[in-house]
Curated annotation (Swiss-Prot):
GO terms for biological process: proteasomal protein catabolic process. The 20S proteasome core is composed of 14 alpha and 14 beta subunits that assemble into four stacked heptameric rings, resulting in a barrel-shaped structure. The two inner rings, each composed of seven catalytic beta subunits, are sandwiched by two outer rings, each composed of seven alpha subunits. The catalytic chamber with the active sites is on the inside of the barrel. Has a gated structure, the ends of the cylinder being occluded by the N-termini of the alpha-subunits. Is capped at one or both ends by the proteasome regulatory ATPase, PAN. InterPro entries: Ntn_hydrolases_N, Pept_T1A_Psome_bsu_arc, Pept_T1A_subB, Proteasome_sua/b, Proteasome_suB-type. Belongs to the peptidase T1B family. GO terms for cellular component: cytoplasm; proteasome core complex, beta-subunit complex. Its main location: cytoplasm. The lineage of its organism: Archaea, Methanobacteriati, Methanobacteriota, Stenosarchaea group, Halobacteria. Keywords: Autocatalytic cleavage, Cytoplasm, Hydrolase, Protease, Proteasome, Threonine protease, Zymogen. Disulfide bonds: none annotated. It comes from Halorhabdus utahensis (strain DSM 12940 / JCM 11049 / AX-2). The gene is psmB. This is Proteasome subunit beta. NCBIfam families: arc_protsome_B (TIGR03634). One of its GO terms (molecular function) is threonine-type endopeptidase activity.
Amino acid sequence: MNPDLNMNPHDSGRTDPYAPELGEIATDEGDGENVTKTGTTTVGLATEEGVVIATDRRASLGGRFVSNKNVVKVEEIHPTAAMTLVGSVGGAQSFIRTLRSEASLYETRRDEPMSINALATLAGNFARGGPFLAIHPILGGVDDEGSHVYTIDPAGGVMEDDYAVTGSGMQVAYGTIEGEYESDLSTEEAKELATNAVQAASERDTGSGNGLVIAEITDEGVEIEEFDDLADAL
């Protein structure tokens, strides 16, 4: 039996086919050097009015070299939902394209958009069974049941919360949010808190920085803005 047939794709000795990265990715030990590739900070906050998602704009190679300073790490995938790009660029982009296509096909066939819970479940199924390497996105959306923020982990786990953070800057960003979050935040207050969280992470995390992308999601649609200076978003 060929031993390679049973090799876990995240085991050592395998070369990462996706680069650069926008987030945590598997360690490649094939050359004897353990290099954990990290980067990015993405934040999602649910409010009564909708969902706010904020991310930085930096892409890195191995978490040590800045390969791009203008990456838009949040994309619309549904008329009232958006998802962040976290992980390898190739894997994250492929994941979003696949999910967007399925959501569009569902709407075409049924003449109504998919619920955000169903979209999150579908995303988890794809992450679990698909070839999407080391992704960990945030899904935010609004439907008839209200505002939703989900995280999708690399193994396909789906978790909903009032707010979520993923990426290498998550510890700093979570600390900022935990100290200021309130359940009755307005959209503008949520934008300010999300911006502060990304800014704090960018100060300490080498994989995060180079501006800000803010997505505001309501029952009317998705609006995405970019800022070179985080102060301009406040």
